[in-house]
Amino acid sequence: MDAPVPAAPAFGGSWAKLNPPLSPWILDVINSMGFKNMTPVQAGTIPRAVKNQDCVVEAVTGSGKTLAFTIPVLERLSRREEPYKKGEIAAIVVAPTRELATQIHAVFHHFLSSLIPPESEEETGDVEAHAPPFASSSRSPSPQTPDKPLFPLPMLVTSGTPTPYETFQSTHPSILIGTPGRLAAFLLNPRGLAIVRVSELDVLVLDEADRLLSSPDHRRDVERIMRHLPKQRRTHLFSATMTDAVEEMIGLGLRNPVRIVVNLKDKRKDGEEPKERRTPMALQNTYLVCRHAEKTLQLIRLLLCESTKHERSKFIVYFSTCAAVDYFYRILSRLPSLSKFHLTSFHGELPPKIRETALSTFTSHPSSHLSPAVLLCTDVAARGVDFLDIDVVIQYDAPTDPKTFSHRAGRTARAGRRGKAVVLLGKGREEDYVDFLNIRKIPLTKQPYINAYLEEVDTPQALDPEATTLLHSIRQIILTDRELSDKAAKSFVSAFRAYSKHEASFIFRTLDFDFNSQAISFGLLRLPAMPEIKDWKKKKEAERQRLEKIKSEGGEVEEKEIIEWEDAGVNWDTFAYASRQREAARLATLAQRADNQSSNDAARAEARAKRKIKAEMREAWSEQKERKVRKEERKEKKDAKKKYEWELEQANGEGDRQSDLANIAKAQAERKKRREREEESWDEEIGKEYKSLKREIKEEKSVKESSKGGAGGGGIGGGMFDDLE
């Protein structure tokens, strides 16, 4: 078991040392949550945000940014002398995803629902200090209970809010938390304009601001919201990275903001300068080098090694596409080696309710190293979603946007806890990604290759034989349901598309992409029909011929590893879907296709015959006669040849002359009669076809002439001489 990573110390100091001090009821809630000290970002942000200052906060993921804006909003709400009236909004928090908005809402809800009502003062002791100054006047004289806090609870405005206006009118919230599109629709809808009053708005918070502003749709909605709100407000931007879009927004929407940048530095030996980093100090950030064909194998071994040897119990595995998450969830959950793992699928194409259920199932699972929980997901769970107990993050695919790397890795080692992150990199050029990240202040250390005995070794020189074994195991699973084969092909294609759109394309080059190797890792039955694969095979064959030519000329050639591929032996006509409905639809399609094929064959044969007849009809009479003459000449030559052969036999003394002459004469007579019958039949058939075609041509001509006469006036000349033909 590796040595424990020490928890990162909180350099922000005690909550009691804040100036101005926080309200006692807020401190009580913070203490009940187990936070004894502030993080640096909280110590730097809260005092300024409580005062009348706009804040732009840049800090590493997992540094406590949520409390850094939640506490100032509540403190300003608590210090307000005049209570907010029904329908008035005190603060709006905008988050890029539904999951992040839900978690922020849960934090606000925890604070506001924990207040002690003043009516219970005689029973609970002195609570005067716990209550805000306007507590007695902020509610009607009706008695209050613990179920009715001093402040209205916050309202969540996302796709999961079915009746937002009814909820707003029944609860009268002062704080709104939601996603950009839903908030913009809620506030700017005519009904929202009538019942939601923002003239007294105090604070606007943009969490994960770089992601909010990187999406054109999100940015448009954020700008609409900001234009609707009063200019005399506090605006706070929080993010782990600052982009040009964020800088532009700072100039447009903030007034003299204070910048708060929290950097982490590694401790060094005497004489060494500390290095700045953008990941938590308690994070063991690593990379593992393997062939693409070995990636799924290494993923499985990492899960087994970390859970068995290091007793890790909660994992997140990131893929580049939703299709890959869906496919690998179905495959990995059926592998016997991972039977003790509880797998959950989570990606952006799932309906909101299912996403919410999946996230809840994963976070609430009582995981242990004997029954670990694994979340297979895309970048929808890379930012903002707060997982407090993640032990290991594995990146099956490096993120398309390098800025996302620190957000993915930051799902572990949060709030001072230790954690580990591993990114799987292909052998070769992809190893340059380590230096690329180091320049971006994200240092990585090497995670050794894991062999079949879960031992750490060097990357093998040849393809791990277990990769082929795993390929056959996955294929056996796929062969149980044709739908899995469809999903495998879809995930393979989508993974390549994501690879081709990588921002670090000078490292992740499509020219170096090995389709055979990737197909082994995905367990495909056959390579999908992609133009890129066809081009790749041509280039591969041309390169092979070039190297062979150099070898034949005595030149030296650097041997490159070639990973061969062989399609599985599958009868695709009988390979069935497990779903009866889908299989019935497939069989119906096959039958329809067969009928169409036979109909098409008959139609093509008829078209060929018609073209031949038309071509012969278009021939001049002299050419037709000449063709018949040539045919007769060929037959006469054939008869003359046979006669010559017979005479030659007679000269050599072979055969009976009289009987042979009789046979030849009889055969010639029969051929002549048969030829005459064929010519008569042919002439009759041609005559019928000719008459039929002539009739069709005449009808077409008549229609054209009549339409021409009706449109342009020359109606008499249009068809008056048709009968003279």
Swiss-Prot record:
Ranges of biased composition (kind: Low complexity): 132-142
Residues annotated as domain Helicase ATP-binding: 46-260
Stored SMART domains: DEXDc, DUF4217, HELICc
Biased composition (Gly residues): 709-725
Motif stretch (DEAD box): 207-210
Annotated ranges, domain Helicase C-terminal: 295-458
Any single Gene Ontology cellular-component annotation: nucleoplasm
Annotated segments matching region Disordered: 119-156, 591-725
Pfam families recorded: CTE_SPB4 (PF13959), DEAD (PF00270), Helicase_C (PF00271)
UniProt keyword terms in alphabetical order: ATP-binding, Coiled coil, Helicase, Hydrolase, Nucleotide-binding, Nucleus, Ribosome biogenesis, RNA-binding, rRNA processing
Gene Ontology molecular functions: ATP binding; ATP hydrolysis activity; RNA binding; RNA helicase activity
Protein purpose: ATP-binding RNA helicase involved in the biogenesis of 60S ribosomal subunits. Binds 90S pre-ribosomal particles and dissociates from pre-60S ribosomal particles after processing of 27SB pre-rRNA. Required for the normal formation of 18S rRNA through the processing of pre-rRNAs at sites A0, A1 and A2, and the normal formation of 25S and 5.8S rRNAs through the processing of pre-rRNAs at sites C1 and C2.
UniProt-annotated location(s): Nucleus, Nucleolus
Protein's name according to its UniProt entry: ATP-dependent rRNA helicase SPB4
Any one GO biological process: maturation of LSU-rRNA
This enzyme's EC code(s): 3.6.4.13
InterPro entries linked: DEAD/DEAH_box_helicase_dom, Helicase_ATP-bd, Helicase_C-like, P-loop_NTPase, RNA-helicase_DEAD-box_CS, RNA_helicase_DEAD_Q_motif, SPB4-like_CTE
UniProt comment concerning the protein's domains: The Q motif is unique to and characteristic of the DEAD box family of RNA helicases and controls ATP binding and hydrolysis.
Binding site for ATP: A59, V60, T61, G62, S63, G64, K65, T66
Feature: compositional bias, Pro residues: 143-152
Residue numbers covered by motif Q motif: 15-43
